[in-house]
Each structure stands twice: as structure tokens, then as C-alpha cells.
Amino acid sequence: ISCAKTMASVLHQLCNEIWFQGIRMVSYHRRRNHPSAVAYGTQFRGGVMMDFKEGEVLYFNKPLGWTSFKVVGHARYHICRRMKVKKLKVGHAGTLDPLATGVMIVCTGKATKRIEEFQYHTKEYIATIRLGATTPSYDLEHEIDATYPTEHITRELVEETLKKFTGEIQQVPPAFSACMVNGKRAYDLARKGEEVELKPKLLVIDEIELLECNLPEIKVRVVCSKGTYIRALARDIGEALHSGAHLTALERTRVGDVRIEDCLNPLDFKEWIDGQDLVMSDGL
């Protein structure tokens, strides 16, 4: 009975927090005219017109090869074109590498103030990892620089090793990353051939699951906290297996409650936004 009361109290507090946070990521509604265009319930404000200056939150499925900056620029261009304005504040809530695909949250206008909030939501990834070889960037951006034995690796060993990466872990970010080193981006220094030393960061891996094991390739599902580099996780898994590893594919399938199926391909954004009713703003 005591446990039941405690659980009820926790659930009550949680529900209150969700309510006072404006439903946050839990409640969202599908926009008209496109099955993959999703917006927060708080965005409707009693109507269906979109007000990008006041603030809208858009969900995109970033294509392979696109930078996060390109997704933001593409959205900004077509929004400004429709609104007939020269500028609009637009930003994203979490970078994806060019070789990764998946969920990107893009905020406009006053909604950009919520970017930090969105960044702290849990993220889910599907990662394909090649064992037995490494690259300087821990992915396919660079050529293989070393090979390692894999004959000793079995499915059972992989499953046991993955268990070591759940909970709080220390992770050293990749040298080819946006981390700052003495006021400069780490990737700028790394591309110049300079040695980059980055300090380990405390992260949380909520879940890690082996989906496929076709050695020397494995596919895993990872649920993790803000700041986790899946490329670095692949590196660490390889080392823990007394081998090497690098990432060959990565898809971000969820951010908070926003799933990949809720997202719009940026290539479809022009057609979608041309079918929407917008609040037209002056003086931007």
C-alpha cells in the first residue's frame, strides 16, 4: 500500500509538471495537408494558421549528405519566400553529422528560445558498426587507417560487452567534432593535422540493444542523453571487444516523443509550406 501511494504521488507530480510545461513533447497534432508535418498543440492557439515569427516548431527527417546547417537554411529560405520577408530567426535543436539521417527539430521566431529545452530530451539512434577497422573520424568521412582481428568476436561476446555501456559512462568526444579547444573547433584543428586532446564527458546511456549481428558488422539501438557521440561509442565498443570499430550508418529515430515517422523530408518542404495558411508579418 505504501509503495502504491508513493507511485501515485510521483505520477501526480509528473502529470502536473507535464501540464505546466505546456504539454511539451507529449501532446502533438498533425498539421493538415501533409501526413508528416507535425506541430505542437501549443502552436495552434485556437486556429490553423502558422505564425513563424511568433514561433513554430518543425520536425524534419534529415537526408543523407545534408548538413544540419543546410536543413535550417532550406527551411528559412522557403519560409521567408512565402512570408515575403528577408530574414527570420531559425535554429535547430541538435546537430546531426552529414553522414547521419533522421530526426531534426527546427524552431522559428520566438520558439528558438525553446531550443535548449529540446536539446535535453532523450534521443534514440539506430547505428550500424563495422568491427575490425578504424578511421580517424570514427565513421566513413575518412578512410580506414588501421585493421584489427575479429575472429575471437561472437554474438555472445558482443551482447556481454554492450551491457558495460549502460548507465553513466565517461566518453571522450571525437577529434573531428564541434567541441571547442582553446576557442577553436576541434574538427578545424584535426583537419589541419594538429593533435587534439579532449576531456571525457559524463553521459547516460539508458538503453543499448543488439538488433543484428552479421559479423564483422553489428546493428544496435541506443537511447542516450544529450551530448552523446555515437561515433565515439562505436570506437569504445570496438576497443572493449579488443578490436577496432567505426560507424557505417546512423539514423536518429527519436528525440523526446518526436519519432522519425512524424518528420518531413526537407525536399518536400516547399510543396508543404506552399499549401499552408500563414500569418504574414511586417518589419522582419
Describe each model-derived feature in a short phrase:
Residues 18, 39-284:
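Catalytic/RNA-binding core of pseudouridine synthases
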Residues 12, 28-29, 33-34:
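Intrinsic-disorder-associated, low-complexity terminal segments enriched in Asp/Asn/His/Tyr and depleted
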